[in-house]
A protein has these predicted regions:
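Intrinsically disordered, low-complexity segments enriched in polar/charged residues with Gly/Pro
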Residues: 15, 34, 117-120
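Glycine-rich flavin
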Residues: 42-52, 56-148
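Basic/polar N-terminal segments that are highly enriched at the extreme N-terminus
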Residues: 1-20, 24
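Residue-level detector of secondary-structure boundary/capping sites
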Residues: 13, 20, 41, 68-69
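N-terminal capping segment at the start of a domain
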Residues: 25-33
Length: 148
């Protein structure tokens, strides 16, 4: 009798795959780091590379297409990314931690963010210094914010 069972990918396997993807990305990030610093923004290609690698899904709940892994995996990936470009690692840290935080919210909030598109990225300012004014059809935001 031939077995048709396939080996499921474990969290350890996924952890190792993500670490390897981050290590593979280091040379590319090094090449782009000068332009990232000069332009004061991460190249769109770098954001796409991190999306494709699954870095923003590390802490995202499985029910919304994420890997639901531990913060250790996230920090290990971030440390590897930093070897290529510190600015990129900072952006990964700011944006990549929010799925963990959003997972602590009510299910309704998670559904609003990931219900239609589980690739939605979220970031916020931890130092709310602006003003929000209700306007017809939504809200108007104004003010100046420090780095998130």
């Amino acid at each position: 009798m031939i077995s048709t069972a396939t080996k499921e990918r474990t969290n350890i396997d996924l952890h190792n795959e993500l670490i390897q993807k981050a290590e593979d990305l280091i040379p590319v990030l090094k090449e782009r780091s000068e332009s990232a610093n000069a332009d004061r923004r991460i190249p769109k290609e770098t954001i796409q590379d991190m999306k494709d690698a699954g870095f923003f899904k590390i802490l995202q709940p499985k029910q919304y297409g994420g890997f639901e892994l531990d913060p250790h995996t996230f920090s290990e990936v971030q440390l590897r990314v930093a070897q290529g470009c510190m600015s990129t690692a900072w952006v990964l840290g700011v944006v990549g931690i929010h799925p963990f935080q959003l997972a602590l919210y009510d299910e309704k909030a998670q559904q609003e963010v990931w219900g239609e598109d589980d690739n939605t990225l979220v970031s916020s300012s931890y130092a709310p210094m602006g003003q929000v004014t209700p306007v017809e059809g939504g809200f108007k935001f104004s003010g100046h914010w420090q780095w998130s």
